[in-house]
């Protein structure tokens, strides 16, 4: 279950229209350690059109060679990507809570807000408080002066 503005979010219809994804925080109530990340609500994949489907497309100009398929992501069951966090969740899931920090309308905004909160909370400088060990795969805890 996710919480956003004090309300439980259990269904995709509870998000405002046009929401692309959200920035979230997973909190370990036992250790006080947290993880900040982002999650998209929908995944899109390209499926190559069959010969029959291509033949059905009429008109002039270039015909598409694929169809875009959009599906709801695994946001309901998602907890994060950090290995240590996922290990601790295996044995102690009841002591974790998930909350949504903010919503985003597109991919660029989602990445911006995730970075914004990671830097606001100085996650790389506080490894005792956060599971996060990198930002965008470019900035790492190990590269900072100790």
Range-by-range predicted roles:
Residues 1-146:
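Structure-specific nucleic-acid interaction/processing domains
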């Amino acid at each position: 279950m996710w919480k956003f503005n004090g309300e439980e979010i259990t269904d995709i219809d509870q998000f405002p229209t046009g929401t692309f994804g959200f920035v979230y925080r997973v909190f370990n109530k036992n250790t006080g350690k947290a993880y900040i990340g982002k999650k998209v609500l929908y995944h899109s994949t390209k499926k190559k059109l069959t010969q029959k489907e291509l033949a059905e497309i009429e008109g002039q100009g270039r015909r598409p060679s694929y169809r875009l398929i959009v599906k709801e992501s695994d946001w309901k069951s998602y907890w994060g990507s950090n290995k240590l966090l996922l290990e601790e969740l295996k044995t102690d899931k009841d002591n974790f809570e998930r909350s949504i920090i903010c919503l985003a309308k597109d991919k660029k905004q989602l990445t911006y807000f995730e970075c914004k909160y990671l830097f606001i909370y100085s996650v790389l400088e506080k490894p005792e408080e956060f599971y996060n060990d990198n930002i965008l795969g470019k900035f790492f805890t190990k590269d900072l002066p100790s």
